[in-house]
Amino acid sequence: MVCTRKTKTLVSTCVILSGMTNIICLLYVGWVTNYIASVYVRGQEPAPDKKLEEDKGDTLKIIERLDHLENVIKQHIQEAPAKPEEAEAEPFTDSSLFAHWGQELSPEGRRVALKQFQYYGYNAYLSDRLPLDRPLPDLRPSGCRNLSFPDSLPEVSIVFIFVNEALSVLLRSIHSAMERTPPHLLKEIILVDDNSSNEELKEKLTEYVDKVNSQKPGFIKVVRHSKQEGLIRSRVSGWRAATAPVVALFDAHVEFNVGWAEPVLTRIKENRKRIISPSFDNIKYDNFEIEEYPLAAQGFDWELWCRYLNPPKAWWKLENSTAPIRSPALIGCFIVDRQYFQEIGLLDEGMEVYGGENVELGIRVWQCGGSVEVLPCSRIAHIERAHKPYTEDLTAHVRRNALRVAEVWMDEFKSHVYMAWNIPQEDSGIDIGDITARKALRKQLQCKTFRWYLVSVYPEMRMYSDIIAYGVLQNSLKTDLCLDQGPDTENVPIMYICHGMTPQNVYYTSSQQIHVGILSPTVDDDDNRCLVDVNSRPRLIECSYAKAKRMKLHWQFSQGGPIQNRKSKRCLELQENSDLEFGFQLVLQKCSGQHWSITNVLRSLAS
């Protein structure tokens, strides 16, 4: 689960730290800031409810771009020698693990903690020293404590998926589920081990399971894969082993809060075609303190990375913080009627490893007659790792899975996914596998169109049907350089070594606008940035602002021809500048015959 609350676009520039060998590549990645100033929660007393105030349009955004730029720019940089004192410095001095924790540890303790942190992505050293039954603050809205629920609710099977999880973290997940789920509602716990190599997860875990099962025979089941199948297929393995009417599918680094189960089971009992997500809080990866997260719906951008969204306006109008939140998608952990999950098609096992399955499930459920909700009265704390140790880069898997979703479920809007990933719509070169069965499932379930989904379920999502060309933009004078958004704070486009990632995505529209950078996913996000002639200088300005101010944002362009501003008649061209890293800068000047080309053309680029 890699969704976070807020991101800031970073630049695609690499910097060598003076006197050090570290190369910092500032990419378009999720640089996390909190959407709402959060409080580290230490006490057990519930905080008073905050008055509900509708967010005025600052949607909580995604984190996760793990592309690596080093390979495409290494020819332009050289490793700087380390200073002797830096070479002798302790390896843990710059680790984020010790920013807010561990100052009192001995050097040996720090080394051990850092080694475990690098392996797990969170502070396993601290986790091993925390009690399994530690108390959690009750972060539910106060109204949740006054709700009543039916006496007769369906039982639930809780499934935990893991690979090489720290044993103490896994056991705390199990223990919190047992302690904070009413015994008459929790039928069993199922552990799906996706072929872990960690020895602790074999003998010691077996000892723990045997101890529990000696008191409650068959209560904990363990499913062990003989090879790694990935998160998606592991969830399905857990579902297959479950026997309760309701199945809860979770990561194995969570802690359940009091009263989480009753609201969920009540909503599913009322309508078995509802898939439910709890509201999530954060377990800080470094000090394991609980950070309260604001209530949110769950959605996605056009690359199909998951994102937290503001609750819809209809929810705010209720002025009831306990009300279910209608959600376009899921972020990975969810609770579902066991039989309905099978009827709707489980998860797409043709997907690989991780990513996109949560979006696909949400789209499928909505289009095929079900619904998705987030419940404010059901709260789960979840560790957001500092890094994912089980894979170096999730991007390739998410991209492949996203294209698979697009081809099955998104109709004419599948083009948006290809555009967001900067991939040709024909002959993409990416094998998405056989989707025949998934298309047959859609037909069998008589599902609605994706346009219906956008209009009825996810109206916040921006549509980009006016884009007629996209990709990287190159000049004939220097073809190894591409137009790049440059430093985000300066709004000045630059020419940079071509790498084809988000900062170099260019979109040309039928209204002759040139968008540079990410396709803004929703109407609540910051607007797209358009290329504008500002006092004879190229600048990137929010498109809506530039249009409202009647700025010079329209450009005549045809493939292999000049890019000329329609009002000023100046052309976007390259000019040599030896002071710049790559020797060229972008200028607006009298047209001299320079030509531009863009990677993918959808319709004719008539000037």
UniProtKB/Swiss-Prot annotation:
Q: Which residues lie on this side of the membrane: Cytoplasmic?
A: 1-12
EC number assigned by the record: 2.4.1.41
All copies of the Ricin B-type lectin domain together span 469-599
So where does Mn(2+) get bound? Answer: 251, 253, 382
Keyword Metal-binding present in the record's keywords: the answer is yes
Q: Where are the transmembrane segments?
A: 13-35
Which residues participate in substrate binding? 194, 385, 390
Q: Which cysteines are joined by disulfide bonds?
A: 144-377, 368-447, 482-498, 530-543, 571-591
A GO BP term here is: protein O-linked glycosylation
Region of interest (Catalytic subdomain B), ranges: 324-385
Tell me the protein family, please: Belongs to the glycosyltransferase 2 family. GalNAc-T subfamily.
Q: Which PANTHER family does this entry report, sorted A to Z?
A: N-ACETYLGALACTOSAMINYLTRANSFERASE, POLYPEPTIDE N-ACETYLGALACTOSAMINYLTRANSFERASE 18
Annotated protein name in UniProt: Polypeptide N-acetylgalactosaminyltransferase 18
**Organism field:** Homo sapiens (Human)
Instruction: Tell me the name of the encoding gene.
Output: GALNT18
